């Protein structure tokens, strides 16, 4: 069984992430989405919320059975988690040349430390090339419509998250 490991923060999951996830299923029997947990990095969504959002979007939009998609966390080196779960290869999405430069450095280091693990680069679709989780969070925080950039369940979750924070900023 070919197992792909697709790692990121997914805070929030975007349609660009889903494009890469969907393409991963062409190459792998199972895709494990690994959410990186960094104590120093403050996330908008908790790990549990991100698991739910990814799982729901994966099932709804990708029409995949739950046995082909798994969501886990990791706080170690990615290669250590990949070895632990028996991953066949790592998946990395590319939006542009800047991503390629960074990802080639990471793949090089990973290859030196874990030569048995290959990194597979998947190009983002045309619409996914301009989407970043950071931009989506900024748009949502200002009350903008993020529906074109994220799955419907994520758009709802962002709306609720920022609606409650904007409501608490109001002065009576």
UniProtKB/Swiss-Prot annotation:
Residues the entry annotates as binding substrate: 9, 41, 78, 92
Keywords carried by this UniProt record: ATP-binding, Coenzyme A biosynthesis, Cytoplasm, Magnesium, Nucleotide-binding, Nucleotidyltransferase, Transferase
EC number, UniProt record: 2.7.7.3
Known pathway: Cofactor biosynthesis; coenzyme A biosynthesis; CoA from (R)-pantothenate: step 4/5
Gene3D superfamilies: HUPs
GO molecular function: ATP binding; pantetheine-phosphate adenylyltransferase activity
GO term, biological process aspect, one: coenzyme A biosynthetic process
GO CC terms in record: cytoplasm
CDD domains found in the cross-reference section: PPAT (cd02163)
Localization of this protein: Cytoplasm
PANTHER family from the UniProt entry: PHOSPHOPANTETHEINE ADENYLYLTRANSFERASE (PTHR21342:SF1)
HAMAP family, A to Z: PPAT_bact
Official protein name in the record: Phosphopantetheine adenylyltransferase
Source organism (scientific name): Bartonella henselae (strain ATCC 49882 / DSM 28221 / CCUG 30454 / Houston 1)
Gene label: coaD
């Amino acid at each position: 069984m070919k197992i792909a490991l697709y790692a990121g923060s997914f805070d929030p999951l975007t349609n660009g992430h889903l494009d890469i996830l969907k393409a991963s299923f062409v190459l792998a029997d199972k895709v494990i989405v690994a959410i990186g947990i960094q104590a120093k990095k403050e996330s908008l969504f908790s790990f549990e919320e991100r698991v739910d959002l990814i799982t729901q979007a994966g099932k709804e939009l990708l029409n995949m059975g739950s046995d082909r998609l798994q969501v886990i966390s990791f706080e170690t080196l990615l290669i250590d988690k990949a070895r632990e779960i028996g991953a066949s290869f790592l998946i990395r999405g590319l939006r542009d040349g800047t991503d390629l430069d960074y990802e080639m450095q990471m793949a090089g280091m990973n290859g030196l430390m874990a030569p048995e693990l290959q990194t597979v680069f998947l190009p983002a679709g045309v619409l996914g090339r301009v989407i970043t989780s950071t931009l989506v969070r900024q748009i949502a925080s200002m009350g903008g419509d993020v529906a074109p950039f994220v799955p419907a369940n994520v758009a709802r979750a962002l709306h609720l998250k920022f609606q409650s924070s904007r409501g608490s900023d109001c002065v009576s």
